[in-house]
């Protein structure tokens, strides 16, 4: 049997780089999941060990699938529904019967639009859309990213011919959306019909360790930005979806918008990334976006 040709030096270096990257990503995912679940246990109610282990495994699985795709989705995914175009009469009927308000997804800290793949797929099945994924430099300040979001929303409205968009935000993305909607100078020209925040720390996170980026300090409890947000009543219909056992945003009350005029929906036991892949969460989001506008 003929022996395999030896690898070139370049191929060996490439394989070594891929292996090292895989180990680094795997290690980072493991540290994130195990560390955050351990911290969560100090601030939320106890539950069965088997349920905790199942949710930990689910969070590891989802992180393991989505995080290696992060670099790719800096280039892909501006039109999120392009991946899930429904074919046939049933799909076309659903889309024609649905409201044509565009949906803009706003990702969270250290993430990009890849995290919305599951939710975009679920919403596309209901005929909602068109859907756009907004990427922003997460290391920049929340205020500057709110200005970027405003420009992106204006571009989507111009592209689609719609007067408004619906925002669907995860984690820090919800704070960026609230910052944009809280600015009195923007209110007259605001192009947002409805806003959904999912696992967003509206009252800040408990974590007191190091955080990267210019906007990181605004994520902490008691930050000036979050205190300013708390003083503003929401002028757009808003829904906050949060988990009883979010490994990043806890206790659950820190995600509430009820006191500001929003609506809260609580789901049981989902972790910070896996909440975006929950059929129940997708159902809540779709129902809210389909509600008739207040008169």
What do these predicted ranges mean?
Residues 1-103, 117:
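Flexible, membrane-associating and regulatory peripheral segments of lipid-active enzymes
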Residues 99-101, 232-238, 259-263:
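Short, proline-enriched alpha-helix->beta-strand connector loops that line the catalytic pocket
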Residues 104-114, 120-124, 128-235, 241, ...:
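Serine-dependent carboxylesterase/thioesterase catalytic core
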Residues 119, 250-257:
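Short alpha-helix in the alpha/beta-hydrolase fold that links the catalytic acid
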Residues 133-137, 265-277:
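Short glycine-rich catalytic loops that host catalytic nucleophiles or stabilize transition states
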Residues 146, 276-291:
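Post-His helix in hydrolase/transferase enzymes
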Residues 152-156, 284-295:
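C-terminal alpha-helix
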Residues 243-249, 272-273:
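Acidic catalytic loop of the alpha/beta-hydrolase fold
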């Amino acid at each position: 049997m003929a022996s395999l040709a030896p690898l070139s030096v370049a191929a060996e270096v490439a394989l070594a780089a891929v292996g090292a990257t895989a180990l680094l990503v795997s290690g980072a995912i493991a540290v994130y999941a195990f560390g955050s679940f351990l911290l969560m246990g100090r601030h939320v109610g106890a539950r069965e060990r088997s349920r905790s282990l199942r949710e930990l495994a689910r969070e590891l699985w989802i992180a393991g699938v989505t995080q290696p795709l992060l670099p790719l989705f800096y280039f892909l995914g501006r039109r999120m529904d392009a991946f899930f175009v429904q074919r046939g009469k049933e799909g076309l009927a659903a889309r024609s019967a649905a409201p044509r308000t565009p949906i803009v997804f706003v990702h969270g800290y250290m993430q990009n639009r890849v995290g919305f793949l599951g939710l975009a797929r679920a919403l596309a099945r209901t005929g909602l859309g068109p859907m756009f994924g907004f990427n922003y430099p997460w290391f920049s300040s929340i205020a500057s990213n709110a200005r970027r979001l405003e420009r992106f929303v204006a571009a989507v409205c111009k592209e689609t011919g719609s007067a408004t968009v619906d925002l669907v935000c995860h984690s820090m993305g919800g704070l960026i959306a609230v910052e944009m909607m809280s600015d009195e100078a923007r209110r007259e020209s605001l192009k947002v019909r409805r806003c959904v925040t999912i696992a967003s720390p509206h009252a800040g996170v408990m974590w007191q360790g190091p955080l990267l980026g210019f906007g990181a300090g605004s994520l902490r409890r008691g930050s000036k930005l979050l205190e300013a947000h708390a003083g503003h009543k929401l002028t757009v219909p808003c829904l906050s979806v949060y988990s009883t056992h979010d490994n990043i945003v806890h206790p659950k009350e820190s995600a509430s918008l009820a006191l500001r005029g929003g609506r809260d929906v609580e789901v049981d036991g989902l972790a910070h990334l896996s909440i975006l892949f929950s059929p129940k969460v997708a159902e809540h989001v779709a129902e809210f976006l389909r509600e008739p506008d207040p008169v």
